[in-house]
Amino acid sequence: MNIILYSKDGCPNCVTAKKLLESKGLTYQEFDVGTPDGVVIFQANVSAQHRQLPQIFINNQRVGGLAGLQAALKQIEGS
């Protein structure tokens, strides 16, 4: 499973999303949008209408933020 997480320091939902992924033993690639490189990657890969953080993609499909991640993981675990 390929998981990409866009996050930023000081974002409580970002911290919770990372802890959730780690508790499930899932690895992920993180881009910190608090850095210039992270901003460029975020703007290139995430639609302008989705600017809240975190933004999470699983297998190139946007699942959204923390609630979307929780729902996606429940669906994956149930299948």
Question: Residues of each region from the PLM?
Answer:
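Non-catalytic, surface beta->alpha helical segment in thiol-disulfide oxidoreductase systems
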Residues: I58-S79
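Thioredoxin-like thiol-disulfide oxidoreductase module
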Residues: D32-R51
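Local sequence-structure signature of Cys/Sec-based thiol-disulfide redox active-site neighborhoods
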Residues: M1-Q29
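Short alpha-helical
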Residues: P12, D37, G64
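Generic recognition of short, well-ordered alpha-helical segments
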Residues: V15-K19, I41, A67-G68
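Structural micro-motif
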Residues: V46-I56, L66-A67
